[in-house]
Amino acid sequence: MKLKRLYPPQKSVNSLHSETGTRCEVAGCPPLRKEALLFFAGWGMDETPFMHNLPPNKDLIICYDYRSLDFDSTLLSTYEGIYVVAWSMGVWAASQVLPDSNLPLKQSIAINGTPFPIDDMRGIPPAIFEGTLNNLNEATLQKFRRRMCGSGSAFQAFLEIAPQRPVEELKEELAAIGRQYSELPLSTFVWNKAIIGESDHIFPPKNQEQAWQKYCNEIQRYDGAHYDEKILKENLAPAAASSKLLIAQRFTKAIGTYPHEARVQQQIARKMCSLLQQHLPAHSLRRVVEFGCGTGTYSRLLLRSFRPEHLLLNDLCEEMRHSCRDILNERVSFLPGDAEALDFPHGTELITSCSVLQWFEHPDAFFRKCENILNAQGYIAFSTFGKENMKEIRQLTGQGLAYRSREELTASLSALYDIVHTEEEVISLNFNNPMEVLYHLKQTGVTGTCNQSWTRSKLNLFCQEYERLFSPGKGSVSLTYHPIYIIAKKR
């Protein structure tokens, strides 16, 4: 197996330069970033088709050529976090090598492949695999790639960036995959997410569905072929990464003003803590995790009310550690990072948060992860926001988060948890004018992923319409918050 690291060009004598200016490194130079995206490409690939898909905030390391599954992790040894994406036959290769790698894995996504690549029910039917191997030549390789791409236009686009490996080498690789699959034990590695193309003509979609029944936490489907440049780009250079980065940046900027402006969030934190006191057993909690702790408003309430033996605080923003420094000690620790990707300590008794879950991309997968982490009597408890939240902003700008209803959230939880308590309320804040509303949102950081660009005319129109539509009384305008509170016990 070959591993290569790709990143934008820097001054170095230890690099190879492509026509695009991307650097491809086999070994030698230190990583540029603390985290890496480890991509297991499919059979017959090299780095060429993927050199335009560099992650915005991670190094990209590509694995390919599975004539051997010897996995040299030298390039990965200094990273603090590894995000794995695997495609096609790379899913099988990754499933084999990752369990014994001891890498700091934070997330794993499988695209159009399975851990059982040669299987009538869970992969490529053996007769088709053998036929491809026995008849492989330049002409049949191009036919395979045409089926892989799904359409003539996608195939022509792929040919411009196709790998240049000789067909005899590809035949050796395919034969080695068949031999190794028959000799090696089946993997039990569990993936965070599997993505299935419903028009995949290489790995039949029904077989993929069957393969993932026990080996992934979430299945995502899309209407596309086995090789889909858009899907690969979204996962190798995801907009999600940049949106999470934007969220972190905006909350970081609001650290100094958040405690004063976040009146509703403070009210919600007090109520959430009161509900926990009412509905959780009276005995003290040993291990508690709070995700999205922010400046520590809810954290301090948890400490005073429950005195846990250990409280793990987590936030997307590393800078929040400084805001919580007064409560950090041997009993209270801080773990920065994306809660959706991190692994929290197993045996935790309570996983909780206030005003955070609405930012998550895959809350259902997070609920499943928490169920695995909690002890037998554990609870998940959180507040989030419902569909009426900031309805004024959504109506006037067309932008906002995809809020879920209380019923939708409890339905998602009910497969794994007993619902202990749910409630919701509507809170209306009054401001002197619409400009104060915008200032309030900016000072609390809750503009989040919104990329609204304001011109003078747009701003004037926004203010006029806001006053016309959302003025409860003379000389004031309103802003709606719609908190939802949920406490659930592991079943």
From Swiss-Prot:
Keyword hit for Transmembrane: no
Gene Ontology molecular function terms on file: carboxyl-O-methyltransferase activity; malonyl-CoA methyltransferase activity; S-adenosylmethionine-dependent methyltransferase activity
Catalysed reactions, as listed in the record: malonyl-[ACP] + S-adenosyl-L-methionine = malonyl-[ACP] methyl ester + S-adenosyl-L-homocysteine
Keywords associated with the record: Biotin biosynthesis, Methyltransferase, S-adenosyl-L-methionine, Transferase
SUPFAM superfamilies: alpha/beta-Hydrolases, S-adenosyl-L-methionine-dependent methyltransferases
InterPro entries tied to this protein: AB_hydrolase_fold (IPR029058), BioC (IPR011814), BioG (IPR007398), Methyltransf_11 (IPR013216), SAM-dependent_MTases_sf (IPR029063)
Superkingdom: Bacteria
Keyword Repeat listed: no
EC number: 2.1.1.197
Region of interest (Unknown), ranges: 1-249
One Gene Ontology biological process: biotin biosynthetic process
Pfam families: BioG, Methyltransf_11
Malonyl-CoA O-methyltransferase, as annotated region: 250-490
Pathway(s) this gene product operates in, as recorded in its UniProt entry: Cofactor biosynthesis; biotin biosynthesis
Family, similarity comment: Belongs to the methyltransferase superfamily.
Its biological purpose: Converts the free carboxyl group of a malonyl-thioester to its methyl ester by transfer of a methyl group from S-adenosyl-L-methionine (SAM). It allows to synthesize pimeloyl-ACP via the fatty acid synthetic pathway.
Protein name as it appears in the record: Malonyl-[acyl-carrier protein] O-methyltransferase
Lineage, top ranks: Bacteria, Pseudomonadati, Bacteroidota, Bacteroidia, Bacteroidales
Gene, per the UniProt record: bioC
